[in-house]
Amino acid sequence: MNPLILFLAGGYSFWVGLMLISALLIPTSQRPSSLILKSLALFAGLILIAVSMTPIAIWWYAGLLVASIYWLIAYRTKQPLAERQSLARRGIAVCLLSALVLEWPYAVLPKVPVPEHRTLVILADSLTAGLEENDFTWPERLAERVDSPIEDLSHVGAVVKDGLTMIENVDLDGKLVLIELGGNDLLGSTPADEFHRNLNELLQRLTAADCAVVMFELPLPPFRYDIAYAQRSLCNRYDVSLIPKQYLLRAIAGEGKTVDSLHLSEQGHVQLADFMESFLQPAFSR
């Protein structure tokens, strides 16, 4: 996978942007060269954060923009006041700290919910199903390692709406459901409101069946805040454990892990099976 795509889709640009903006907190002289460097760091940081479209609260983006403008005013006036500069730095610091509080929980691996019945149901697209009939997929590899039934309902080309079809006539009561859907919605033309509606209905049905639900967070291209926000808000509403997108990207990124930059090779299936075995172990080891 292209390193730039990985950097953006994995949300790494958000954290690098925060690091660049944190340079504004370092007290420096009023020399023009120092102010120019800090201004460049500010603009670069804002651009990286903007293209990441991290689904953090809108008020945070607004607050960061206001704090950044105030910093520029406080430091670019001919006779800057120490009080203004101090207030500008405090405003930037509040934005950075609140970003850590709001976003860090989505960057760490959640605890897997323990289902009533030790059965894993997988709703997924071709990333899981594979492109060829003879592909030895990660669910098949996982099934050989754990002493629990695995029902792999994945199929090529599936979108979130297809998840509703997958679970028809399937006994879901009290089972653990893993969702790896949405990538084809992003690559296709599914509007954000339709994505929200379909995912809402899918999660509603799963929680009504008393399922424990886990979902892969979608690695997003720039400027898809709407899809990212819809996924996070619905997962919060239905108490769905969201696996940070970095973990899925680790199975995709790297030489030899995919056959076409999107679909897993044998090596990619092995790595994802290794991760899922470790992650799901608490649900299977009662």
Predicted features along the sequence, with ranges:
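Short N-terminal helix-initiation segments at or just after the protein's N-terminus
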Residues: 59-66, 122, 159
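Hydrophobic core of alpha-helical transmembrane segments in multi-pass integral membrane proteins
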Residues: 20-22, 46-48, 64-73, 95-103
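Short, charged beta->alpha transition segments
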Residues: 72, 108-110, 201-202
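Cytosolic-side transmembrane helix boundary signature
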Residues: 61-95
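Serine-esterase "nucleophile elbow" of acetyl-processing enzymes
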Residues: 100-158, 162, 166-173
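N-terminal accessory regions of nucleic-acid-interacting proteins
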Residues: 54-56, 78-79
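Alpha-helical cap/lid subdomain in secreted, periplasmic
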Residues: 5-53, 62, 84-90, 144-145, ...
